[in-house]
């Protein structure tokens, strides 16, 4: 086991497209009562989602101890496992609110795998202004998607401590199986003790400059934990940008060619 070493530089990309186009997320102007508002397009027939469907798997079930999460389908079919109950949503169903401590996961509705799913997701959190509070936000999504892409498409080995570290910093915790007693408390223990404390001591950062657009905000979050403040290096992103200069110049050239 070892902390991840990002293989791409995607900080600043908007929309952020991952897994050969299987998921694309872009920022929208957020309402005053929401921490973020993302517009997402999920293509279940591509990339990681196609692999999960082929093996009958789903993304990891998780929960948020203080955040409310909101989903609204604009096009296609989306399923949300809501405390073990599958809820199927379409554009006619309006917004679905997911309260704190709800064990949930979203995926394309089975039987409609070839459809694109267009949706918006947002969140609110009364504890967001509290000192030391962690929240699910853009840096979390950028790092989680970046890490998954390296694992599933570039041969990076999946590391449980790395996952726990990223989830904890995003105010998100993996849900143990339903039969585990006090499953939410077990999830919190794993995220905080193993992900944040032990992971920090072992060199696992929750955010990486190669993937994080607002690196300054990520550094501020890591500064709040004694176990993670050593990763809060304001100059790290410039060094990472220099390391990946060849990739960035190639991408800029490709974009310029398309616009001509």
Swiss-Prot record:
Q: What is its EC number?
A: 1.-.-.-
Mind listing the UniProt keywords for this protein, alphabetically?
Oxidoreductase
Q: Which GO terms describe its molecular function?
A: oxidoreductase activity
InterPro entries, per the entry: RmlC-like_jellyroll, RmlC_Cupin_sf
Q: Which GO terms describe its biological process?
A: terpenoid biosynthetic process
What pathway or pathways are given for this protein in its record?
Answer: Secondary metabolite biosynthesis; terpenoid biosynthesis
Q: Which domain of life is it from?
A: Eukaryota
- Function of the protein: Oxidoreductase; part of the gene cluster that mediates the biosynthesis of macrophorins, isoprenoid epoxycyclohexenones containing cyclized drimane moieties. The first step of the pathway is the synthesis of 6-methylsalicylic acid (6-MSA) by the polyketide synthase macA. 6-MSA is then converted to m-cresol by the decarboxylase macB. The cytochrome P450 monooxygenase macC then catalyzes the oxidation of m-cresol to toluquinol.
Q: Which family does it belong to?
A: Belongs to the oxidoreductase OpS7 family.
Other remarks on this protein: The macrophorins cluster contains a single gene insertion (encoding for the terpene cyclase macJ) compared with the yanuthone cluster that produces the linear compound yanuthone.
Q: Give the protein's recorded name.
A: Oxidoreductase macE
């Amino acid at each position: 086991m070892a902390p991840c070493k990002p293989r791409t530089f995607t900080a600043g990309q908007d929309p952020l497209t991952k897994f050969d186009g299987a998921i694309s997320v872009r920022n929208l102007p957020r309402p005053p009562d929401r921490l973020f508002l993302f517009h997402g397009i999920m293509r279940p027939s591509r990339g990681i989602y196609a692999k999960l469907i082929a093996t009958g798997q789903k993304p990891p079930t998780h929960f948020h101890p203080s955040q409310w999460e909101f989903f609204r389908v604009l096009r296609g079919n989306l399923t949300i496992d809501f405390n073990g109950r599958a809820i199927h949503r379409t554009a006619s169903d309006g917004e679905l609110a997911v309260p704190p401590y709800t064990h949930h996961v979203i995926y394309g509705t089975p039987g409609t795998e070839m459809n694109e799913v267009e949706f918006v997701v947002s969140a609110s959190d009364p504890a967001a202004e509290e000192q030391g509070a962690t929240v699910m936000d853009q840096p979390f999504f950028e790092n989680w998607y970046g890490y998954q892409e390296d694992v599933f498409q570039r041969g990076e080995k999946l590391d449980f401590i790395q996952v726990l570290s990223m989830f904890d910093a995003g105010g998100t915790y993996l849900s143990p199986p339903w039969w585990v007693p006090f499953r939410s408390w077990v999830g919190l223990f794993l995220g905080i003790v193993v992900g944040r404390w032990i992971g920090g001591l072992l060199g696992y950062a929750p955010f990486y400059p190669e993937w994080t657009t607002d690196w300054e905000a990520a550094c501020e979050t890591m500064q709040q934990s004694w176990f993670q403040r050593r990763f809060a290096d304001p100059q790290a992103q410039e060094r990472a940008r220099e390391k990946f200069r060849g990739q960035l110049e190639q991408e800029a050239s490709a974009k310029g060619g398309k616009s001509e």
